[in-house]
A protein has these predicted regions:
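Short, basic/glycine-rich phosphate-binding loops at helix/coil junctions
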Residues: 86-94
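Basic, often amphipathic N-terminal segments
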Residues: 1-78, 99-160, 170-189
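A short acidic, often aromatic-flanked loop/helix-cap motif at beta-alpha or helix-coil junctions
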Residues: 85-86, 169
Length: 189
């Protein structure tokens, strides 16, 4: 079994990224004293797959898949619906999007699944993590109610391939996420 995985992330454009980083910093201020906290660049995970440890071309294949995705997809706007906290470390404090986000991103998932050698049963759940925290759930739920929700849709213009441990169990696993490639989505001029 592979110890590493590759995830494909949808990344915000500069304006949305600045706003999301401000919200993430605000969330971190509100929870830092209650437990460990870790942040990653704002992103929506589109798909995750095993990275073949014994195949030296595995990362190159992931980058090729990313290029294929970027060449066939255009920038997309997603509408924030709510902030919520869960017991899962990987969804400590997240921004949920409206129902149209799943419909909009399903073809992206299908494209990535089709080019995968192994079907992992990945379930698309469009959300954006503001932070990852070991703080008590009740405190994170309280914080989710205090953060101002953006009123306007957020524009996502880039995608990236990120390697990380195949199982995320602690903040060190989150911090180990490493971008191997990033590119702009197709945008006809």
């Amino acid at each position: 079994m592979s110890l590493l995985a590759v995830s494909y992330w949808l990344l915000p454009g500069p304006e949305a990224q600045a706003l999301l980083e401000q919200l993430s910093a605000l969330a971190c201020e509100g929870i830092r004293e209650a437990g460990g906290v870790c942040r990653l660049p704002p992103h929506v995970t589109l798909y995750s797959d095993h990275l073949k440890d014994d195949d030296p071309d595995s990362q190159e294949q992931a980058i090729d898949r990313l290029h294929q995705l970027a060449d066939r997809r255009r920038p997309v706007q997603l509408c924030p619906k709510a902030f919520e906290a869960s017991a899962l470390l990987t969804q400590s404090l997240v921004m949920r999007f409206n129902a149209e986000a799943r419909v909009e991103l399903l073809p992206w998932l299908t494209q990535l699944c089709t080019s995968s050698r192994v079907e992992l049963g990945y379930r698309l759940d469009p959300h954006l993590s503001l932070l990852y925290s070991e703080a008590p759930l009740e405190q994170r739920q309280k914080l989710a109610k205090q953060i101002p929700l953006p009123e306007d849709p957020l524009l996502f213009e880039r995608v990236s391939a990120v390697i990380h441990p195949s199982t995320i169990t602690n903040l060190a696993d989150i911090a180990a996420c490493t971008t191997i490639f990033e590119c702009e989505l197709f945008s006809p001029r």
